[in-house]
Amino acid sequence: MMGQLSQSQDLGAGLKSRHVTMLSIAGVIGASLFVGSSVAIAEAGPAVLLAYLFAGLLVVMIMRMLAEMAVATPDTGSFSTYADKAIGRWAGYTIGWLYWWFWVLVIPLEANIAAIILHSWVPGVPVWLFSLVITLALTGSNLLSVKNYGEFEFWLALCKVVAILAFIVLGAVAITGFYPYAEVSGISRLWDHGGFMPNGFGAVLSAMLITMFSFMGAEIVTIAAAESDTPHKHIVRATNSVIWRISIFYLCSIFIVVALIPWNMQGLKSIGSYRSVLELLHIPYAKLIMDGVILLSVTSCLNSALYTASRMLYSLSRRGDAPTIMGRTNRSKTPYVAVLLSTGAAFLTVVVNYYAPAKVFKFLIDSSGAIALLVYLVIAVSQLRMRKILQAQGGEIRLRMWLYPYLTWLVIAFITFVLVVMLFRPAQQLEVISTGLLALGIICTVPIMSRWKKLVLWQKLPLQNTR
C-alpha cells in the first residue's frame, strides 16, 4: 500500500523522537545565517527582512508539499524517490545526483571554515590538518550508527538554538531601552539610513537569492525521519513547526540586527552582522563568542552533509541508479560505502582546488549555486503529479498541501521566474549556467546507466517505498 511504511532490510531505525525534532530545527539554522546574513543586509538594507520573508514562505510551501509525499511514503531518498515515481526515473536520477553533489561540495567548504577558526586559536597547527581531522572524525562518527549522528547533531543543534535565543533576548532588551551597558534603543535604524528599502526592490530580490542558500537543509528531516520508528509523525510535526522556526530563528534575529546597527555600517561584511551587534552592546569577547557559535554551526552542517550525501547515494544505489556496492551496509545498518565514497569525493574536490586550474574549481563551486532552486522545483512538480496518482489509486493522504493545485502552480511559476532572473543577472548567471550544464551532463549518463544496469530510466517507478 502507498501509505504503508516499508522498513528497509538494511537501514535501521536508530533515530529517537528528540533526535528528529532537533534535526528539524537544526535544518533551518545553517552556518550561512551567521556568516552570510551580513552580505544580504549590505545588499538590501533593512528590507532584507522581506528577502528572508519571501524565501521563508517559499520554504514553508516546499516543506508542506514534501511532507505530503513523505507522510504517504517515507523514504530515505525523499524527493529524489518521489521524482522517480511522479515524473520519471530520469528526474529522480538527475536530481538525486545533483543533491548528492551539493552536499559533497559542502563538506570541504564547511571543514575549511572550521579549520580556519581553530587555526586562529592554535596557530601552530596548519589549517589543512584541522580540516582533515574534523572531516575524518565526523566520517568515523557517521560510520558507527545513525544514532551517533542523531546524538551528535542533537547537541550541536541545541547549542545553536540556545545561542540564537540568547541573542534575540539580548537584542530585545537593548531595543526596548533596558540594556544598561550601551546607549542604544528603538528601531529608527530601520529607516534612518536611506529608508527601509534604500537600494530598491531589485536589491531585495538579490538578497533573497543569497538567503535562499541559508534554508537549504530544511528537507533533511524527511530523509532522517525514514530511519525512525514513526516517520510520518515526525514529518508532520516538523512540517507544522517550520513556520515558527523560520519566524524565530531568521526573521526575529535579523530584525534585531537591522534594528540595532546601520545596514551600511563600515566593515559589516567582514566583521559579520551578529558580531557587530555584540560589539555594539559591549559584550566582552564578542569575536571569540561568534567564532565559537560559527564553529558549532559549520561542524553541525558538515555532520549533516556527510549524513545526507551518504543517504542519497545509498538510495540511488537501492533504486539501481548507482553501482550496487554503494548500497552496502555494516553491522550497525549504516551505508558505510556511501559514507566513505562521499568523503572521498569531498577530498577529491580539495585536490582539484590545489592542482587544477582555478577556473575548474570555480566551475565546480558555481555548479552547486542553483541546485537548491532545482530541488524545490522538482519537489513542487512531483507533488503536483503525485497527488493525482494517489487519488487515482485511492491512497490515503494524511497531510495535504494548502490550496492545491493553485499554490503549487504559484510556487512553480515563482521558482521559474527566479531562475530566469538569475540567468540575466551577472552575479548569478554563471551559477545557473554551471548548474544547468552539470544537470545536462548527468542526464546524458542516463542511457549509459540504462545499458549498464539494464534498466529503463525513462519510466516511472511503482508507488512503493524503497527506503
Give short role names for the model-derived ranges.
Residues M1-S8, T81-D84, W90, A111-S131, ...:
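Helix-loop-helix connectors at the membrane interface of multi-pass transporters/channels
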Residues T81-Y82, G88, S120, G194, ...:
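TM-loop-TM module centered on a large, flexible mid-protein loop between adjacent transmembrane helices
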Residues S6-L11, V48-L49, P123-P126, L158-D291:
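Helix-loop-helix junctions that connect adjacent transmembrane segments
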Residues W155-L156, I325-K333, L373-L430, V456-Q459, ...:
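C-terminal membrane-solvent junction of multi-pass transporters and transport-like membrane proteins
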Residues D75, L98-N112, F215-S228, Y250, ...:
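Membrane-helix boundary/coupling elements in multi-pass transport proteins
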Residues G12, I25, V35-F130, I134, ...:
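Extracellular loop-to-transmembrane helix junctions
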Residues W128-S185, M216, T239-I243, I365-V378, ...:
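Membrane-interface loop-to-helix entry segments
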Residues M1-G36, I41-A47, V59-R64, T76, ...:
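Membrane-interface "cap" regions at the ends of multi-pass membrane proteins
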